[in-house]
Amino acid sequence: LYIVLCAQMFKHLPPAGKRVIFQLEQSVSSRWFTQNYMNILTESLGVLEYSLTNIDFLAKNGLKYPNVHYLPIGASLDEEFEGNATQKKYDFVFYGDSLSSERRRRFLEKLQEKYSVKICNDLFGDELYAIIKESRVVINIHYYEGALLEMPRICECISLDVPVLSEGTSDQDEY
């Protein structure tokens, strides 16, 4: 059994009957919810979904229980990070795609007028975690208007003991 995250990013996937997709995209935009991606989800053994809004979207598109299961994401403090006070270099850190989002770029430029802001576009794993820990706050700026709350990102930061400042969301009543 294979559990696949970000399935839309891979050219080749494990066999449909042996894979479960952990769906982490937002249904408020068709950027990732293409017909090909919907086919990948539908053909898979199962889909794990963190957002009730996304579950409703999937159901309206014919993909529902028993093939879709709600699995909310939560923070889990790793002992490796507990009590690791790190010197703060940045007021804010933003990580994600700021290059193709004019909305995010404008927001970040305005923030940089008054604060020290570190922008990470293509950084992952331990390198990213080290920078997050050097920040007073992680800023969460939506790619889309009316976006869902980016719980995977928020829980990742909370697990690193760094607070997150986020815009409001269309699904904030879920949290």
List each model region and its residues.
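Nucleotide-sugar donor-binding catalytic core of glycosyltransferases
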Residues: 1-17, 21-175
